[in-house]
Amino acid sequence: MMRIFFGTQNDTAGLFMRLTLGLVMLPHGLQKVFGLFGGAGLQATMNVFTTKLGLPAPVAVMVILAESAGALGLIVGFCTRLCALGIAMVMGGAIFFVHGQHGFFMNWFGQQTGEGFEYHLLAIGLALALVIHGGGKWSFDQRIAR
């Protein structure tokens, strides 16, 4: 069972995928948890998620954990498949609840009312590749699976 969950190839593909996704997602998680990088912080984020978006509080907490702890998990390669699946689900929810209504493209020229979902779709693709492939070289998963 451990090999199925933690098993991975000893290659750099998983390493580059998890570092890329983890490093891109971590600042978003830090915005939500600590208010860094112009973020609102935990209390304000929870308020937006539960009142404006109508998410149940446990779901809102899981979203925040996926973007923060999940991103850290990807960076170090711990529970890569679980962290990547969580991020894929969060990005799917972001498309469904927020960004899908704004079309495909990001708001490059400031002419849309919001951001499209192209970024989220890329993150989903990268996350699902990690779910299939695993964390790769220099991951805790690799050491656990031995």
Label each region the model flagged.
Residues 1-36, 57-65, 69-146:
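Extended, low-polarity transmembrane helix blocks
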Residues 34-55, 59:
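Membrane-interface interhelical connector segments
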